[in-house]
Amino acid sequence: MGKEIQSKLQKVMKITGIDAPEQKLMPVILSISRTLDKRITDTINDYKKIHNIKLSALEKDKIKNELLGLTKKTTTIKFEISDTEKNTALDLILNGLERNKEKVSGTIYAKLNVASNNFDTQYLKYINEQEHGKNQLLVIEVAPRVTKEKVINTIYKEYDNLSNYHFMAIVFRDTDWDTISDIAINCEFLKKEHDFQLFNRTTKQKKQELSDFLKNNKNIDFNLSLVEAVEAFFDGVSYGFQFNDLFVADNDNTKILIFQKIELDETVLPCPDCMSTFVRGNSYPRVLQKSFECQNPNCPSRSKIGRGKRYDYFSVKRNLQLKLGNKANNIDRDLAVQYRRDIFHNTDTIKQMLITCYSFAGDTVKYISAKAEHETYYYGRNVFYGGFETGKTVKPTVLQNLLKTVLDNVHVTPCKPTQSVRKDKYSIYEGDCCNILGCIPEKLSAAITSPPYYNAREYSQWPTLICYLVDMLVSAKCIFDKLEKDGVYMYNIGDIVGQDNVFVSSHMSNKRLMLGFFSMLIFKLIGFHIKENLIWDKGEVQSKRNSTDKFFPTYVRPINCYEHIFVFCKQKQKPKYSQTICVFPPVKKINSKGENILGHTAPYPIDLVKLIIPYINDDTNYVLDPFLGSGTTVITGIKYNFKTVGIELNSTYFGLAKRRIEES
């Protein structure tokens, strides 16, 4: 070590009053100054490329500390630190000491002593105290004869026994989609929170936003009943569980719903790196989920610009479990591969997957089923078994009440299309399908569409998810009224990630949205029956999900590879398809140059439209597509000889559809 460096180190020790070996102090100086951050990041990225591996944030921090010399080196990465870099770091620290001696001294002291303080052990003890007497995973296995009332009442009873931010899995065996849908929606609207200040400050605006949307809808009569329904809906924040995933077995007999419990908890959470409760907690990564920022000036994790460590309860617990390295937390690689997609094959491993993927070693698991079983120790978890609650009547959710009131006030005035093309085998109209359907002469025996997804495309922007559902409700009601009495409506939709903006309009409302189940609710309110749900397996889709190779609880999440194709009917009918998993690729709309060769952002394939053919009972009647888009439904009708009607609101897409149909 050069004389200049030694001199500066001595000066640091004199100013701070810290007496530490130079070989121990220098790595701390380098770490706090962050002069090597970019070079270390580049080195780690090169290491990942060479070895074709992925690293978690904890693993990157471990390597960084080794390269800086803070901890004993275990990797083979070569990394030399020059005297110039050391001098630069020392100059930055000395400059910082001149400006804020107390703050910088505290950071150096904390960094030097962090190794001797076993905060991980302390924090693990703290977590165990918080979770004592509670479950960290709830699994409910629903047999065919178990009613939705029993399931919902059981969920309500077990809710308070489940630790916050932890998971619930519901396994359905030969259960109809109608029941699954009702249970899922009840899970998200289980309770009401009245003390969430971020919502309380904007309640008036949220009520006004929805009221204005309803008032401006020409197909809805806004009256006192809707005013009262809006007031009731926004009487607090609906909460309970947040939807994560829906697994479907490839034989369609088994489905698995995954939810995470999220409720408001304002309890101060100590910093995981210094155990200080001197924290700030005014941030919410998700609605009702609070995060904190450490304000301890001596915390070893303070950033170069003085920001404290940011953290929330579940991320701290997961990182701590990862650091502890308990082998019981290692997920079997073959098991992770088997559930890599949300369409799976082997139902024999469901219990193992749920317990090892959605809980940690040492957690308590509550397993509800109709079968009586004894307590077991399973993959390092304590598993207790229980039965169902009685099937008391379940009240409608506030969402159901709101949408039902909207439906009661739908009054559509027919109007002529802006332009139209009518041929022997098809007709296409430009305008709003709700208003045009009352004017067209064609009789409709069936309908099929892929509706605009809530805020998933540039042409489908609604202020909130509720506003989107209102529009879809009105259009579905108009189609129900126009269809013949034995009419069928095939509806293709997938669950997406997006900001629902229902209670808070910001990034914190970003989550997985159950568009499929919300659509089922709409159709059920109108009077449709769910005949079947064909699962469109889109194969290997691109996804950031499950990109980790860390086979560790809550890191392993499935790739969403399917969409729903619901078959709704006006009268109860027997299903037409014995095989309900449909495999065909999505439309390729982008060429090798990155150009959109179809001109539409969300075209759907001809193979999907062909699924409607068995439901066409009268070949003199027409098949409707109320959201025609690029014209695929009409093109398919021409090719396979059935009559079609297409309606498109967007004039640009109407022109695109017209051109494609003429060229087909």
Located regions from the model:
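C-terminal helical cap(s) of enzyme catalytic domains, especially alpha/beta-barrels
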Residues: F654, K658-S664
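Core catalytic lobe of class I
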Residues: M1-G655
